[in-house]
Amino acid sequence: MDSLEDFSARLREALEPDVRRHFSPEFVICSEYFDRFTTEVAGRDLERLGLLEEFRSPATVEEALARKGYVPRASIALAWMLEKLTEEGFFASSSEAGGARYVSRVPVPADSGAKEKALAIDPSCAPAFTVVEELSTHIIDYFSGRKTGEEILFSPARLSLWFDYFHNDNLLYAVNNRLGAEAVARALPRTHASTVLELGGGAGSAALALLERLSVDGRLPAIGKYFFTEPVPTFLRRGERALRQKFPDVPLEARKLDMNASLVEQGIEAESVDLVYAVNTIHVANDLEKTLRGIREVVKPGGAVVFSECVRPRPGQPIYVEFIFNFLENFVRVVTDPEIRPTHGFLTPANWRAALARTGFDRFALLPDVETLARDYPSFFVGAITARRPSAG
């Protein structure tokens, strides 16, 4: 048994059965290969950008960008690449008054065939690799200021990449939807049909996974009304079409909705929703505290929120799925807060716990217990957060 198979077996053994079934050996092993692939791409991109030579001696991100004539906005993406390569032992870093200084320790990683190994195990994980490759192809345009991340990754010609990426057939993404569905199934009341509001529903893969999960248990009648919402019309229409086609009997209302604005002012009645659901959405709220307070406003007393998220096990830890998103403005240009959101991107369990407590939620739970798992498996970062609005308040 090779080391990745052994790692997969030990990790899965640490999960309770209803969670374990969402983390197949294929998923765990392909995730590790994708992590290697992302690290290797980051190293190759530094070479292509001519930035590797700038770190033969210690330098800050800003110094290296300025010497090469690259735009300042690339600092976030470059800092992540350097942090990831540092964590993997290829760079070293030191903190100084002028900021972190990085220096190359050993040659950047060579191509290990990680993509090919992952695809040999399960070809359905291809979309994750394709998105990274697409970004890498245009990375010089981004660093030079000729294109934004949105222009590279979200042009109309590339939307199909994202339909494939966020699809439940994508081995490396579907776990977010399946785990979220498990958490919602546990949180939904069993005494009455519920009104569910999904935020940032995208093309519908999270809603489909949830309704499939409820259908298996014979609990589709638990949904009294499902608000499927999404701010981007193209995704909204696609998601609504998929949901109506597969679950025509579910009471569905699809509407454009922006979590960064008042939900009540957009037509969601105060204290009308039993459960607010979102998958990999809330972490990109422009003002996290404001968005959570807006969500609380529409949740019934005693109602729940379930957020299936990438969860950063420890502060500052570079997570490979961030690589592509660090090039997108709505991911990085957010309101920060030292307690609940010290930086852009994914939050730690402690950040989520503090953010939800501050905004009037209690009974915080995390499925699975990422904090405990991270002691032995530091690269485990998928979790479903559940919290409730107190019954009296």
Give residue ranges: language-model regions:
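N-terminal accessory segments
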Residues: M1-T195, R213, D217, P221, ...
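Local beta-strand N-terminus motif with an aromatic residue
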Residues: A193, I223, S272-D274
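Class I SAM-dependent methyltransferase SAM/SAH-binding core
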Residues: T195-L197, G201-V264
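A short acidic, Gly/Pro-enriched loop at the edge of an enzyme's catalytic core
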Residues: L263-V276
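A short glycine-rich, Lys/Arg-flanked "PGG" loop and its adjoining helix->strand segment in the class I
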Residues: E289-A304
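C-terminal alpha-helical "lid/dimerization" subdomain adjacent to the S-adenosyl-L-methionine
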Residues: S308-T359, R363-D369
